[in-house]
């Protein structure tokens, strides 16, 4: 990879909680012939999605956006497609990517994130897994349980929006003492490797 010659690592955005309605896997618009989960009840991708008339458009979608059908991250064939040997993670890391940023990591089950991590580290221990988590990743509660992003079996780090908010608040005139308190709180919560 050309970027590596200059000491630059490319981190890809892994959007694994949903696909586009126009993807070859869902194919709502028919761009890929008659195949795809939306058009073919016998599609190998059909089990990746939740089709039900109770949903707008007839399928579960990310935050109700019909162009973003949600996938079931617990479907074995989907998990294998993303994390298996020769899967998405394996392919792109072996082509030279430095790691992945997991889009909406706080909406992915911990078990799925752990499988993604295993796939990433299988390619190389230096490969990086970053997660989009909007709140304090050490105290996040979701899916009816405390999340385990930074306990050694999930993410290497997170986007750290609380830090961004503290810095932007200071730049926009927020009290320096409160900013310091916020930043020190983040440093106390997060394990050093995740900072």
Predicted regions and their residues:
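Conserved, well-ordered alpha-helix/loop/beta-strand core segments that scaffold catalytic motifs
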Residues: 92, 98-101, 107
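Substrate-binding/active-site clefts of carbohydrate-active enzymes
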Residues: 1-94, 116, 122, 139-140, ...
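Short, solvent-exposed turn/loop segments enriched in Gly/Ser/Thr/Pro and often Arg
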Residues: 14-23, 103-109, 132-137
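Residues at alpha-helix caps and immediate loop-helix transition turns in enzyme cores, especially N-
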Residues: 112-113
């Amino acid at each position: 990879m050309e970027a590596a010659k200059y000491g630059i690592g490319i981190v890809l955005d892994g959007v694994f909680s949903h696909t586009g309605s126009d993807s070859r896997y869902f194919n709502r618009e028919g761009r890929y012939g008659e195949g795809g989960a939306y058009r073919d009840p016998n599609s190998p991708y059909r089990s990746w999605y939740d089709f039900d008339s109770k949903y707008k458009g007839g399928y579960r979608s990310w935050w109700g956006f019909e162009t973003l059908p949600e996938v079931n991250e617990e479907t074995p064939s989907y998990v294998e497609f993303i994390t298996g040997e020769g899967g998405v993670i394996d392919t792109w890391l072996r082509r030279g990517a430095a790691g992945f940023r997991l889009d909406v990591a706080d909406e992915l089950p911990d078990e799925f994130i752990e499988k993604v991590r295993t796939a990433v580290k299988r390619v190389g221990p230096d490969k990086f897994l970053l997660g989009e988590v909007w709140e304090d990743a050490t105290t996040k509660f979701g899916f009816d349980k405390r999340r385990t992003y930074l306990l050694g079996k999930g993410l290497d780090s997170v986007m750290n929006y609380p830090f961004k908010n503290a810095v932007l608040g200071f730049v926009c005139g927020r009290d320096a003492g409160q900013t310091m308190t916020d930043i020190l709180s983040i440093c106390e919560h997060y394990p050093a490797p995740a900072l």
